[in-house]
């Protein structure tokens, strides 16, 4: 097995067993003695395929044996297998007929980064966001029972995803309806229990066996006739299990808890899954795996190797280093440290996005003012509200797509009370290869309808810093949305002074057409404006809108064009049209933004072209409208 990136194969490895097991039907024709070798081949294939395309890396390496065991024991796709989030689903995709297409992973019209129902019958539920698997599998189990089917429903969820309240809502509900389902906890950093070994594996086999289950039920019938005897027996059993297993919480919720067992021990996995397959009621299996298993760098640094970029051929010439602009997240990371130095009231909150939101430096410099709440967006927002009530100044660093999960709290707990909370909304707009589940397509639409909300869209790195200060120093809730990646390399001023709220700025004076740019599409607007001699306005604020500037543009131009990387429906352009209607200003308005579809995964530039938001598409749309209005 490779131990360095140089050793990862650049050509498809020889995998005779995997060649025979590229579907679960082929897998089940293999003998159990061959599965260990198959695991080695699948791990090598995963290293090769992700090296060709880039993608999520460590999680898949950690579930090789579990994936094989699940498809070997259960009758997929008839039995429903639901993967939480989907980062770990690449081995599943390879084993379910998509091996030949893995070279298209995360590319336009290629294999998706996450399980998709439209992609394969083995992808029984589309995922991307965390902690949905148990609810989905429970719904499938209930529906199957109502239909008279005996198919099995299995949810595989990681220990990180189990921090979200939604997962526990489902865990609480399933025993109430006596659902025949299996939840597998993939504990890949041993955060819940370290109690793994031969004795624990042996106990799991016994406790999951049909013989033990029958004996337990028989004893219950006999002892229940003797006053107090069954209660004593039950407590003795719990005490004996409690010395070896950490499942008291799940048992109290009504689950039959088995484990923890070694998630890389194929014989134990297969034996335990076979036993649990035949048990009735809600079953819970705790397996412990190692993220990045089999590839030393990923085992040592599972966070750093959560995902990797495409590997270049070994003989490729060294690429010249480019002087790159700072990432927008990096600008935020520097700003929050600077503002924290200036204001001791500042606290930073994130739902498990420290690295992605660039809060590492802040967490190290201000550990007592940094709060990572794990995958708990609802809690993050209301936690910020509580802090604001007591005079702190919370900054919630969150991805646009994940803020959707805390929307009620944003309205009910923050906005209704007009609390001073700044939302630094990263990954706004299209995000590229991760596709529609991770796109920030809707934040302008769902934020601008909230009374009292300050909503801002910077056009470059310097404006981001200024608008963050503006939102932070504002009284009431505020949001600054910014995209993934880098900007145009603007000169960033050190000042923490705010901008005047609700005021845009004219970046280019032209005639005939006025382009009202909301956000980073300003750069494309300026390119188009040079060809059309158009006026370009950097609007900066979606709410409050610079109504005076819009009125002036309407009075002096034949056509107004609104430009945003947000859904056209309800977005910034809609705010412009709503104002014009209220002011009784009749003007032709062209709205350019994201169409009313889910934009599929591709490179960001390809997605913008598809949506008509590159310079060529913007120019074509404007010319088409000008032709219509004569």
Curated annotation (Swiss-Prot):
Which keywords does this chain's UniProt record carry? Answer: Isoprene biosynthesis, Magnesium, Metal-binding, Thiamine biosynthesis, Thiamine pyrophosphate, Transferase
Alphabetized GO MF terms: 1-deoxy-D-xylulose-5-phosphate synthase activity; magnesium ion binding; thiamine pyrophosphate binding
Task: Identify the metabolic or biological route this protein is part of.
Answer: Metabolic intermediate biosynthesis; 1-deoxy-D-xylulose 5-phosphate biosynthesis; 1-deoxy-D-xylulose 5-phosphate from D-glyceraldehyde 3-phosphate and pyruvate: step 1/1
Top-level taxon = Bacteria
Q: Enumerate the residues binding thiamine diphosphate.
A: 87, 128-130, 160-161, 188, 295, 377
In this chain, Mg(2+) is annotated as bound at 159, 188
Q: Name one GO biological process term.
A: 1-deoxy-D-xylulose 5-phosphate biosynthetic process
TM ranges are none
Q: How is the cofactor bound?
A: Binds 1 Mg(2+) ion per subunit.
Q: Which reaction does it catalyse?
A: D-glyceraldehyde 3-phosphate + pyruvate + H(+) = 1-deoxy-D-xylulose 5-phosphate + CO2
Q: Which GO terms describe its cellular component?
A: cytosol
Extract the SMART domains matched here. Answer: Transket_pyr (SM00861)
Q: EC number(s)?
A: 2.2.1.7
- Please give the cofactor(s) recorded in the UniProt entry for this protein: Mg(2+); thiamine diphosphate
Q: What does this protein do?
A: Catalyzes the acyloin condensation reaction between C atoms 2 and 3 of pyruvate and glyceraldehyde 3-phosphate to yield 1-deoxy-D-xylulose-5-phosphate (DXP).
Which HAMAP family does UniProt cross-reference here? DXP_synth
Q: Tell me its family.
A: Belongs to the transketolase family. DXPS subfamily.
Q: How does it assemble?
A: Homodimer.
Fetch the PANTHER family from UniProt.
1-D-DEOXYXYLULOSE 5-PHOSPHATE SYNTHASE-RELATED, 1-DEOXY-D-XYLULOSE-5-PHOSPHATE SYNTHASE, CHLOROPLASTIC
Please give the name of this protein: 1-deoxy-D-xylulose-5-phosphate synthase
* Organism the protein comes from: Pseudomonas syringae pv. syringae (strain B728a)
Q: What is the lineage of its organism?
A: Bacteria, Pseudomonadati, Pseudomonadota, Gammaproteobacteria, Pseudomonadales
This protein's encoding gene = dxs
């Amino acid at each position: 097995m490779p131990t360095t990136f140089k050793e990862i194969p650049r050509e498809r490895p020889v995998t005779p067993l995997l060649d025979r097991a590229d579907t679960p039907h082929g897998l089940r024709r293999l003998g159990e003695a061959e599965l260990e070798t198959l695991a080695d081949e699948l791990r090598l294939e995963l290293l090769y395929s992700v090296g060709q395309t880039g993608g999520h890396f460590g999680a898949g390496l950690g579930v090789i044996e579990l994936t094989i065991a699940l498809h070997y024991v259960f009758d997929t796709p008839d039995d429903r297998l639901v993967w939480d989030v989907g980062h770990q689903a690449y081995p599943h995709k390879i084993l379910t007929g998509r091996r030949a297409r893995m070279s298209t992973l995360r590319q336009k019209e290629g294999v998706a980064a996450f399980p998709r129902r439209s992609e394969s019958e083995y992808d029984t539920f589309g995922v991307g966001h965390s902690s949905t698997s148990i609810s989905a599998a429970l719904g499938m189990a209930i529906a199957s029972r109502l239909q008279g089917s005996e198919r099995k429903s299995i949810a595989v969820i990681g220990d990180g995803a189990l921090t979200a309240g939604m997962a526990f809502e489902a865990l609480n509900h399933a025993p109430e309806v006596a659902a025949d389902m299996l939840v597998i906890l993939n504990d890949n950093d041993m955060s819940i229990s370290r109690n793994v070994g031969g004795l624990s594996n042996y106990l799991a086999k016994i406790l999951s066996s049909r013989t033990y289950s029958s004996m337990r039920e028989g004893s219950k019938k006999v002892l229940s006739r003797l006053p107090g005897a069954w209660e004593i027996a039950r407590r003795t059993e719990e005490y004996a299990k409690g010395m070896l297993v950490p499942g008291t919480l799940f048992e109290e919720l009504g689950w039959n808890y088995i484990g923890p067992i070694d998630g890389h021990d194929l014989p134990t996995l297969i034996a335990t899954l076979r036993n649990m397959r035949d048990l009735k009621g809600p079953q819970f299996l705790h397996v412990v795996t190692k993220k990045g298993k089999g590839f030393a760098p990923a085992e040592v640094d599972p966070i750093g190797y959560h995902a990797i970029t495409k590997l270049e051929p070994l003989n490729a010439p060294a690429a010249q280093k480019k002087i790159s602009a700072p990432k927008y997240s990096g600008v935020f990371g520097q700003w929050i440290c600077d503002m924290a130095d200036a204001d001791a009231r500042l606290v930073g909150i994130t739902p498990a996005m420290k690295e992605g939101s660039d809060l590492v430096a802040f967490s190290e410099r201000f550990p007592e003012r940094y709060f990572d709440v794990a995958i708990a967006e609802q809690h993050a927002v209301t936690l910020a509200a509580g802090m604001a009530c007591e005079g702190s100044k919370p900054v919630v660093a969150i991805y646009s797509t994940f803020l959707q999960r805390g929307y009620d709290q944003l309205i009910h707990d923050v906005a209704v009370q007009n609390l001073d909370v700044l939302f630094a909304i990263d990954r706004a707009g299209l995000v590229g290869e991760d596709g529609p589940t991770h796109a920030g397509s809707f934040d302008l639409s769902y934020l601008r309808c909230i009374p009292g909300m300050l909503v801002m869209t910077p056009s470059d790195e310097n404006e981001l810093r200024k608008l963050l200060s503006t939102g932070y120093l504002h009284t009431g809730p505020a949001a600054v949305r910014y995209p993934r990646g880098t900007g145009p390399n603007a000169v960033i001023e050190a000042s923490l002074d705010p901008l005047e709220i609700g005021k845009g700025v004219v970046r280019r004076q032209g005639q005939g057409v006025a382009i009202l740019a909301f956000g980073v599409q300003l750069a494309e607007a300026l390119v188009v404006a040079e060809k059309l001699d158009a006026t370009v306005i950097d609007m900066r604020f979606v709410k409050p809108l610079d109504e005076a500037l819009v009125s002036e543009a309407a009075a002096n131009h034949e056509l107004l064009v609104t430009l945003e990387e947000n859904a056209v429906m309800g977005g910034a352009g809609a705010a412009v049209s709503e104002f014009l209607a209220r002011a009784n200003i009749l003007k032709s308005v062209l709205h350019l933004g994201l169409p009313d579809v889910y934009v599929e995964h591709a490179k960001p530039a390809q997605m913008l072209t598809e949506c008509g938001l590159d310079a060529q598409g913007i120019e074509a749309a404007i010319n088409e409208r000008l032709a219509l209005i004569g």
